[in-house]
Each structure stands twice: as C-alpha cells, then as structure tokens.
C-alpha cells in the first residue's frame, strides 16, 4: 500500500502513464522496493534499481532490468534521462543523495521524484519540533533550489480500499509475490524493529500477531 499511495494518490499517476517509462527505484531490495519493482514492471515500466551485489539476482527476478551495486557504483554516473525516481531511501540519504536522484531525471513537467521519507518527519523525530522544523525547511530549500522543473512529491501512507482490493487480486494471481525477510512473534517486536533499523532487510519484516 505504500507504493500504491505514492504512485496513485500523491503523484496522481495511472498505470498507463508508466508504460515504457524509465523508472529508478532507489534501494530496491527492501520491503517497499521489492514491491515497487514488481508493480512498476507489471505496469510496463523499465526499472533500474540499487542494492547490494548479494541481492542482484533477487531484484532481477522481480523485474529490474538494470541493477547497480550501491557499494561500488554511483547510480548518477550510470543513469540519465529517467521519467520517474521512486526513492525508498529519500532524505535519510541526505541532500547529496536526493540531488543525484533529481539529476538523472528528464528536465520536463512530466518527470516525477517521489520520496518515501519526509524530511519534516525525520528531522522533527531526531531533533524535536523546535530544532527539527527549521532543519527540515532548510533541507527542503537546499534540494528544491537545484531541482529541475519536475513534479516533486514527499509521500505519506494513505489507506485505500480500492487499492487494497486491486493489490490483493495481484497477489492472488501471483503478479506480485511478497518477499519476506523474516517473521517475528509479537513478543519479539523489539528485535523486529532493530532488524528494520539496520536498513538491510531483504524484503518485508513480518510481525506474527497470533499463530493459528
């Protein structure tokens, strides 16, 4: 639903808008990235992504045509003329990372940059409202002052019954196959959060509330 909300709700894109479009998914082997690659590929997009070398086979199986080892290669040196950046790393990568994402986009009004990590939420979380708000505003200014004339979106999760229904259909039809990194019982939720915090989960981290 995170991917659906970002593309459909915030960027106001339709599946047909992505046919044959060049899309870059930053951090494609995580819980959201593995889902985004499959959905975008199903809608006809040509997907490039970053991940560790160990996860290249995974993202290729999901539909990525170009895989970049972020530890050894700089995606901004390899990619250009993209229509959409779906940035799962977002502002956690800092101004430099976001700027590189913007630089690979076509400079026109049909290009989109979507970040899943809102600068306001992160900086206020880290520094509190008093210090976090000015820091977020500064970050936003630094990024947007060098941005091309594109559509810039900071996405937040928003529920959608129609979206959930359609995604459920895709999963049942095996168009989208959820990638599970690990499953934790509810009493081990702290360990699950610690796993997510490493930013090295391979797919989704699942909390098992009740085992039948």
Residue map of PLM features:
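Terminal helix/beta-alpha structural elements that buttress the NAD(P)+-binding lobe
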Residues: 1-212
């Amino acid at each position: 639903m995170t991917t659906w909300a970002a593309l459909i709700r915030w960027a106001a894109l339709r599946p047909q808008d992505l046919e044959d479009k060049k899309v870059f998914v930053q951090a494609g082997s995580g819980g959201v990235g593995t889902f985004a690659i499959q959905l975008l590929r199903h809608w006809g997009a040509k997907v490039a992504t970053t991940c560790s070398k160990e996860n290249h086979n995974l993202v290729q199986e999901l539909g990525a045509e170009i895989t970049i080892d972020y530890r050894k290669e700089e995606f901004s040196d390899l990619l250009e003329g993209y229509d959409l950046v779906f940035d799962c790393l977002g502002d956690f990568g800092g101004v430099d990372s976001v700027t590189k994402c913007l630089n690979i986009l076509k400079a026109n009004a049909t290009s989109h940059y979507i970040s899943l990590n809102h600068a306001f939420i992160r900086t206020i979380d880290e520094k509190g409202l008093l210090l976090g708000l000015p820091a977020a505003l500064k970050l936003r200014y630094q990024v947007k002052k060098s941005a091309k004339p594109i559509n810039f979106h900071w996405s937040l999760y928003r529920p959608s019954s129609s979206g959930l229904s359609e995604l459920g259909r895709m999963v049942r039809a095996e168009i989208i196959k959820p990638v599970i990194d690990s499953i934790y019982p509810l009493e081990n939720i702290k360990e699950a959060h610690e796993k997510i915090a490493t930013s090295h989960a391979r797919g989704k981290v699942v909390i098992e509330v009740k085992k039948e």
